Amino acid sequence: MITVIAIAKDGSIVEPKLDEISFEDYRLIWIDCYDPKDEELYKLSKKIGISVSDLQIGLDEQEIPRVEEDEDFYLIIYKAPLFEEDITTTSLGIYIKNNLLLTIHSDKIKAIGRLHKLISTKKPRIVFERGIGFLLYHILNEITRSYSRILMNLEDELEELEDKLLAGYDREVMEKILGLRKTLVYFHKSLIANRDVLVLLKRKYLPITTKEDRENFEDLYYDTLQLIDMSATYREVLTSMMDITLSLENIKMNQIMKILTMVTTIFAVPMWITGIYGMNFSYLPLANNPQGFWLVMALMVVIIMIFVYIFRRSGWI
């Protein structure tokens, strides 16, 4: 799917179709390309003068965040949160050529959707009138805010998990901890890579950015550093919670083994006595005594009581 938003030379915001675009007629054009078909990708390539193979780089989810300079365009790869069954990350390709900014991605990125909504419902000139560098900043800022929202929500989830953990071991809690830890691993790696991109953007790497744009990128850089620290801290908390969960499971298992051992020990001597009386000896004590059965039973009860007393004194039960 291809969406085009542009600001005309008279300052009006329009949404022309790709075929209708004439780059000379607009001050700034933003094309967003989401999960394009081969035909759409070929049409886009022909229109903007960037090869299909170059465009496919932006669609590769495994691409590492970076800034590249080609003969007539700049390529920025940036990592954004991906909301599926588990929250992970995906790659966003950003191409800048003259007055064109192209975002291309194979997965749905919520930050892009929010920016579209901002442009359609509020004053779009805030985003477009200050140049292509400011539009780039807004895109990266929305992605950074997505990370921030998720990590802030994660803080509440961690408190909830701690309460459940203190209430007792639960397999669902362990699965939730593993899922969150996986998310934080993806986030931490992606944020570190995004930080490296922002280092380049705030150091005059792109000639299309103004001094104000570079100051904005510097703010984003420090915001990203904060998010990296948050993700590292939360990951350590989750690791500690995993250790506690495993310890609780081991304690529970030890309790079960202790109970089984005590039961086995308590009944070992009575079973030994009954085993002896089950043998075919010609003579056994109390075998011919009318009260023999009850005496033997009483002996076994006494032995059991002695074991129970010993275990209680030892604090095992």
From Swiss-Prot:
Organism domain of life: Archaea
Molecular function in Gene Ontology: cobalt ion binding; cobalt ion transmembrane transporter activity; identical protein binding; magnesium ion binding; magnesium ion transmembrane transporter activity
Extracellular domain ranges by topology: 280-290
Gene Ontology CC annotations of this record: plasma membrane
Marked site: Essential for ion permeation: N254
Catalysed transformations (reactions): Mg(2+)(in) = Mg(2+)(out)
Domain comment quoted from the record: The central ion permeation pathway is formed by the first transmembrane domain from each of the five subunits. Mg(2+) binding strengthens interactions between subunits and leads to the formation of a symmetrical homopentamer surrounding a closed ion permeation pathway. Low cytoplasmic Mg(2+) concentrations trigger both a conformation change within each subunit and a loosening of the interactions between subunits. This results in an open ion conduction pathway. In addition, this results in a less symmetrical shape of the whole complex.
Record family assignment: Belongs to the CorA metal ion transporter (MIT) (TC 1.A.35) family.
Record text on subunit structure and interactions: Homopentamer. In the absence of Mg(2+), interactions between subunits are weakened, and dimers, trimers and tetramers can be observed in vitro. Was initially proposed to be a homotetramer, based on the cross-linking studies. This is in contradiction with current 3D-structures that clearly show it is a homopentamer.
Function, in words: Mediates influx of magnesium ions. Alternates between open and closed states. Activated by low cytoplasmic Mg(2+) levels. Inactive when cytoplasmic Mg(2+) levels are high.
Protein name: Cobalt/magnesium transport protein CorA
Origin species: Methanocaldococcus jannaschii (strain ATCC 43067 / DSM 2661 / JAL-1 / JCM 10045 / NBRC 100440)
Lineage: Archaea, Methanobacteriati, Methanobacteriota, Methanomada group, Methanococci
